């Protein structure tokens, strides 16, 4: 396998697989990897040929969090450098969370700290049975600050109180119960489960999926009031009037597959 720390592979269907490729350090991330991931997510988001993005890790781990050498350098750095560094992590997670295509976390093993944050920032997560998760920052005197918006959105504030404060590891089964992952499978079934999700996602309209992601962000946590009613009314009206919406409705009436399939 290439020694590049981040790999991007795209197939004819428009499925892009982004792989954190540092198996010797369990795919821990440093400033270089963070920059490469941000560029990958941003670039794939505007690539019209990309339909779906799958995020995974090389070897037996998904992502073991921050690289120890990088953490050591940051511990010796000043406040300004630390703030700038933390903002790059925030920007990476945000670029993944706001990527206007469906994203799948293919969790092939351990996901610690920032690794858990990457899982939470994906739309759908599938994990192997032996995967272990941990929001472990407090155990080394830190806080899970940059990942917190995504992890709290995934597991809720109540569960976050436990796992943010204890830093204890939890299993894939617990991650499923908490809502962090959607499906837990045997290691041998991981690729099949991801492929099944890909096939299901490819059946949807790409523009409607992008709109659906924006809609979730717009309505989550908001009270149902006149402004929200208008937002949702405009959303469906715009979708109906769009070329993709018209094609989808006509294909349904004609009992044929829409053009995007």
Regions found by a protein language model. Name each.
Residues 1-58, 94, 191:
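Conserved CoA-thioester-binding segment of acyl-CoA-metabolizing enzymes
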Residues 1-17, 21, 169-202, 210-220, ...:
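Amphipathic alpha-helical segments at domain termini/boundaries
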Residues 18, 22, 36-37, 55, ...:
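Terminal peptide-recognition signature
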Residues 40, 88-99:
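Catalytic-core regions built around general acid/base machinery
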Residues 49, 57-93, 111, 223:
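Glycine- (often His-adjacent) and acidic-residue-rich active-site loop
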Residues 60-64, 111-113, 134, 216, ...:
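Short, active-site-adjacent cap segments at secondary-structure transitions
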Residues 94-209, 242, 256:
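Crotonase-fold acyl-CoA enzyme core
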Residues 163-164, 215-219, 234-240:
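Helix-loop "lid/cap" segments that line or gate small-molecule binding pockets
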């Amino acid at each position: 396998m290439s020694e590049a720390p981040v790999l991007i592979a795209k197939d004819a269907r428009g499925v892009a697989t982004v792989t954190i490729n540092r198996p010797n350090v369990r795919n821990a991330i440093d400033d270089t990897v963070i920059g490469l991931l941000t560029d990958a997510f941003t670039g794939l988001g505007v690539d019209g040929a990309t339909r779906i993005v799958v995020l995974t890790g090389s070897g037996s781990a998904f992502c073991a969090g921050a690289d120890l050498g990088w953490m050591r350098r940051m511990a010796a750095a000043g406040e300004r450098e630390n703030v700038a560094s933390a903002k790059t992590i925030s920007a990476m997670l945000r670029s993944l969370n706001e990527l206007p295509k469906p994203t799948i976390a293919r969790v092939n093993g351990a996901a610690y700290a920032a690794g858990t944050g990457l899982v939470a920032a994906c739309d759908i997560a599938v994990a192997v049975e032996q995967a272990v998760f941990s929001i472990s920052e407090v155990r080394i005197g830190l806080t899970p600050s940059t990942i917190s918006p995504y992890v709290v959105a995934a597991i809720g504030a109540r569960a976050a109180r436990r796992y943010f404060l204890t830093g204890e590891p939890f299993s894939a089964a617990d991650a499923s119960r908490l809502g962090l992952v959607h499906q837990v499978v045997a290691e041998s079934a991981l690729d099949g489960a991801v492929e099944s999700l890909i096939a299901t996602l490819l059946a949807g309209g790409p523009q409607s999926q992008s709109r659906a992601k924006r809609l979730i962000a717009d309505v989550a946590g908001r009270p149902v009031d006149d402004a929200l009613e208008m937002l949702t009314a405009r959303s469906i009206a715009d979708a109906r009037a769009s070329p993709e919406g018209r094609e989808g409705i006509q294909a349904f009436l004609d009992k044929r597959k829409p053009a995007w399939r």
